[in-house]
Amino acid sequence: MLSQAEKGGVQNTIQNCVTVLQNDPILADSIRLNLLSERIDIVKPMGWQRSGPTLTDTDMMYILRRMEKYGLYSEKRVSAAIRIVANENHYHPIRDYLNDLKWDGTERISHALHRFLGAAEDELTAEALKIFLLGAIKRVFHPGCKFEMMLCLVGGQGAGKSSFFRLLAIKDEWFSDDLRRMDDDNVFRKLQGHWIMEMSEMIATANAKSIEEIKSFLSKQKETYKIPYETHPADRLRQCVFAGTTNRQDFLPRDRTGNRRFIPIPVDAAQAEVHILDNEAESRAYIDQLWAEAMTIYNSGDYKLTFSPAMQEALQICQKDFMQEDTQAGMIYAFLEDYTGDRVCSKQLYAEALGNLNLPAEWETRAICEIMTAGIANGEIRGWTAHKAAKRYPKYGVQKGWERVTAAKVDADGFVELTDEEAQQMGFPF
C-alpha cells in the first residue's frame, strides 16, 4: 500500500518507490547488488532489449517510465530506492557457483597442469596449483584476505597458458588480462568484478618502477576508490588473485631478499595430454571438478596458503632458472674472491668492486647490503659475516660492514686459544 499525500495522490517518497520496486510484477526480485562487481544488476527479463546484467542509463529510463504509472516521478528518489532494494537483495555470483558444486571424489588438482599444459607431475606443481585455487576461493568468501602468491606459467606460445586461466575463471567476465601498469590511478576499475587477473607476458611487472612497487602491489589487500555515484571514497577489498604467463626464461624480477610471491611453473605443450581448447566443453567440466575438489579442501579447513619449508626450498631452486642475471652481485662476488683484506663496507664495494667514482645514494648502499646479506645466507659468499658494530675504514670513515670469519686456533693438545677479550670476559687473571 502506497502512502498518500494529504491533498490526494501518492507521496513521492523513497519508501513508496521501494514498495513499488518490491511488488510490481515486472520489477519485483529483478534488481540485485552484485557483491563481486559492486554494481547493480538486473537479473530477470524486463521486456526490453538488454545486452548484459549491469543496470544502465537505458534501464533507468524504462524503470522511471514504469514508476510513473504509480504517480512516482522523482528520479532522485527512484535511484535511492533502487540502491536500497538492490542492497537488500544482494548476491555473489562466484560464491553461488562454488557453493553449488558437488565433487565426484576424483583428485584432479595434482594432475591438471600436466593434463592441459604438459607441466611436470611433481609435488611443487601440484602444491602450487592447490594453493592458488584455495587463495582464489578465500578471496571471494573473505575479500581482502592476505594472499600474495602469483602463479606464473612459463612456456612457448600456443600452449594454452592464457586459455587455462580464462577457463579457470569460469566466466569470461570474471577474467581479465587488461592490467598493464601497477601504478594506474584507475587500478580498481581494472580489478573490479574480476576473479582471476592475468598479467600477460608479465607486462605489468616489467613496467613497474622497482621490485618494491611489485611487492607492494601484490601484497595489497584493498584499493581506496570512489565510484561515480558515491560522495566519499571507500575501501574496496580485493576479491581477485593474480596469474602470470610468459615465454621468457628470465622473467622473474630481481629481488635479492627473495621472490616468494612468484611461483614459476614450466609448461610444455608437447607433453600435454590434451590442449585445453580441443574440446572446450570437456575442459570446462574438468575445471568445474577442480573447483569442487578445492572447495572440499577449503570447507575442511585443513589447508594453508603457504608452502611447507621443504616446498619453499624446492621453489627457491626452481626460481633460479628464471631469475634475471644479477651483474652487480657477480662483480661483488668476484671482488671478494681476490680481496685480501679482513673487512669491507658498502661504500668500499660500491667504489672498488663496482668501479664507481661518485658517492653512492642510499638506495645503492641498500642494494649492496642486500647482495651481501643474500649471498652470505645462500652460501654464494663464504667466510664473511656482518660485524656487529660500526668500524673505521681508512678511506670511507666509520661504517657498518662485513669481516672475515676466522677459525679459532687449536693447539696440539686440542685446546682452543682464547683472545685477550674473551679471557677478560671469562674473568681469567691475565
What are these regions (language model features)?
Residues 1-108, 123-127, 358-363, 374, ...:
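N-terminal nucleic-acid engagement/recognition segments and initiation subdomains in replication
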Residues 82-192, 347:
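P-loop NTPase catalytic core of nucleic-acid-dependent motor ATPases
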Residues 187-192, 227-245:
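AAA+/SF3 P-loop NTPase mechanochemical coupling elements
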Residues 193-195, 221, 238-241, 257-262:
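Short glycine-/polar-rich loops that comprise or flank the Walker A/P-loop
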Residues 196-218, 252-258:
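Conserved AAA+/SF3 P-loop NTPase catalytic/coupling segment centered on the Walker-B
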Residues 211-234:
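Conserved catalytic/switch belt of AAA+ P-loop NTPases
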Residues 254-272:
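A short helix-turn-beta junction within AAA+ P-loop NTPase domains corresponding to the substrate/partner-engaging
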Residues 305-430:
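DNA transaction DNA-binding modules
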